[in-house]
Amino acid sequence: MAQAKKSAAAGARTGKAPAPAPAPVRRDPERTRARILEAARIEFAQRGLGGARVDQITARAGSNKRMIYYYFGNKEALFLAALESAYEHIRKAEQSLKLTDLDPVEGMRRMVRFTWEYYLAHPEFITLLNSENLHRARHLKRSKEIQALHSPLVAMLEDLLARGQRSGVFRRGVDAVQLYISIAALGYFYLSNNHTLSTIFGRDLMRPQALQQRLAHMTDLVLGYLAKKR
């Protein structure tokens, strides 16, 4: 109050309006939480649960430990939240494909391409899953939302399969979950093992031409399996 009076008095003497008081800093809980999650995904992907450091996560997020414990409780809970966030990101991206608007064959082709290109663009997704598999999905088993998060994916594939069967281009008796596991495995195994595979076969499997060949091979395998035999 005294400072405000001094500013007003100074303004009166100089003929200038007093400078406005600085606006209070507004907290954005959602943005803070999102920054922490993004930093956690990177740290856990690089170092795993055991090697990841909360100090590094807070430094990446521009936050502090108090915020991590406030939002997530502990390091293991943060790891689970990072996993859920990673799955949520890919599932939302899949929904944006709008496969229900596409011809069944083109929709399946796009699904294969999307999965492959997503893995290439987000290598941290693969390493996060590798890390959780080392723990035998101990954290994901505690998730209350992970199965519901995947229901739209299964429904989307079931729709493609049903429309393809009705139009006579897809064979019957295909399980949507088994199909997705196969699509994911075709890219996941290649990328997660590219160092050893490149070494034992004497090829650079990550060069652009090799990646294009892999996508074409994956697409042919999936569509060839689904094709209705004449």
PLM region spans:
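C-terminal peripheral helix-coil segments that are non-catalytic and often amphipathic
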Residues: M1-P20, F114-E117, A121, S151-S167, ...
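Short hydrophobic clusters on alpha-helical segments that form packing/core surfaces
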Residues: I36-F44, T115, V222
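Amphipathic alpha-helical linker/stalk segments
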Residues: A82-M111, K141-K144, A148
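All-alpha amphipathic helical-bundle segments outside canonical DNA-binding/catalytic cores
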Residues: E106, E145-L149, R166-S182
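Amphipathic alpha-helical interaction segments
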Residues: R35, E106, R110, F114, ...
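Helix-turn-helix
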Residues: A2, R35, E43-A77, A81
